[in-house]
């Protein structure tokens, strides 16, 4: 989460979705929320010019920064050369294999000001490494945080929220105004905490099937379940699960999606077209 580019000679790049965080009050509040410790494995995605990085390093923990902008990596190495526990990797976080940065015995705490233009696919990518993650703290567009934390029946509720809440405890911590960044974005941001479950409270029989069901259900979110899921499950089967085929997908909670997914997994013949 980069600092204001004052006296650095680096302009934020629109193609990288860069908005450098410079409000020290916001930075301090983020660090208090994270509460980093000296023995922890901290991984920061998109550090920018290192405003948050610096505060994380002061905790004494190891900090590995994953930065795509090749002009920023030498700036970061120079700025933090006095911290032997700092390392920067020039890579695209959307394609990066985070397994090389953690082990089950030394899980990582993921932190980042995620580029708004790729935040949703990046979150899905990061969730694939959840077994090596202690927790995640992300600055995101407020609308994305609302979707992550949304409950059934809310306008923001959809595929992202259902799947994130299957894997993690999701907490919206606080909002951040545009003025905290340089350049200022046009929208409000928010900090979210994602804490992966050791075991999902509502474990399904097959996650790939759950993913398919949720994706299909919300592909046409204004249509009823009997229409959106007709390739996967019959109306009679939905009724046998005590689920009304006439309701829209945003009315279903995670337990109902898990029930549908388990049924679809157990009855593969119904998937044949």
UniProtKB/Swiss-Prot annotation:
It catalyses: adenosine(1518)/adenosine(1519) in 16S rRNA + 4 S-adenosyl-L-methionine = N(6)-dimethyladenosine(1518)/N(6)-dimethyladenosine(1519) in 16S rRNA + 4 S-adenosyl-L-homocysteine + 4 H(+). It comes from the Bacteria. Gene3D superfamilies: Ribosomal RNA adenine dimethylase-like, domain 2 (1.10.8.100), Vaccinia Virus protein VP39 (3.40.50.150). PROSITE patterns: RRNA_A_DIMETH, SAM_RNA_A_N6_MT. One of its GO terms (molecular function) is 16S rRNA (adenine(1518)-N(6)/adenine(1519)-N(6))-dimethyltransferase activity. The keyword Nucleotide-binding does not apply. It is an enzyme of class 2 (transferase). Coiled coil: none annotated. One of its GO terms (cellular component) is cytosol. It is found in: Cytoplasm. Keywords: Cytoplasm, Methyltransferase, RNA-binding, rRNA processing, S-adenosyl-L-methionine, Transferase. S-adenosyl-L-methionine binds at residues 19, 21, 46, 67, 92, 113. Its EC number is 2.1.1.182. It holds the Pfam family RrnaAD. The keyword Transferase applies. Specifically dimethylates two adjacent adenosines (A1518 and A1519) in the loop of a conserved hairpin near the 3'-end of 16S rRNA in the 30S particle. May play a critical role in biogenesis of 30S subunits. Belongs to the class I-like SAM-binding methyltransferase superfamily. rRNA adenine N(6)-methyltransferase family. RsmA subfamily. PANTHER family: DIMETHYLADENOSINE TRANSFERASE, DIMETHYLADENOSINE TRANSFERASE-RELATED. This is Ribosomal RNA small subunit methyltransferase A. It comes from Hahella chejuensis (strain KCTC 2396).
């Amino acid at each position: 989460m980069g600092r204001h580019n004052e006296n650095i000679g680096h302009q934020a790049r629109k193609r990288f979705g860069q908005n450098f965080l410079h409000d020290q009050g916001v930075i301090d509040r983020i660090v208090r929320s994270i509460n980093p410790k000296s023995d922890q494995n901290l991984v920061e995605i998109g550090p920018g010019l290192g405003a948050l990085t610096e505060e994380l390093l002061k905790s004494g923990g190891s900090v590995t920064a994953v930065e795509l902008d090749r002009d920023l990596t030498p700036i970061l190495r120079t700025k933090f050369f006095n911290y032997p526990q700092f390392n920067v990797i020039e890579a695209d976080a959307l394609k990066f294999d985070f397994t090389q940065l953690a082990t089950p015995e030394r899980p990582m705490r993921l932190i980042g000001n995620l580029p708004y233009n790729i935040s949703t696919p990046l979150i899905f990518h990061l969730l694939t490494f959840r077994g090596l993650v202690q927790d995640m703290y992300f600055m995101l567009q407020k609308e994305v945080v609302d979707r992550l934390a949304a409950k059934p029946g809310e306008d923001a509720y959809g595929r992202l929220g259902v799947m994130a809440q299957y894997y993690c405890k999701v907490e919206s911590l606080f909002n951040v105004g545009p003025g905290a960044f340089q350049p200022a974005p046009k929208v409000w941001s928010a900090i979210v905490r994602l804490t992966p479950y050791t075991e999902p409270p509502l474990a399904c029989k097959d996650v790939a099937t759950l993913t398919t069901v949720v994706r299909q259900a919300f592909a046409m979110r204004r249509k009823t379940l009997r229409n959106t899921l007709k390739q996967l499950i019959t109306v009679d089967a939905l009724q046998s699960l005590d689920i009304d085929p006439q309701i829209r997908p945003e009315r279903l909670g995670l337990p109902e999606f898990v029930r549908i997914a388990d049924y679809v997994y157990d009855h593969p013949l119904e998937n044949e077209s």
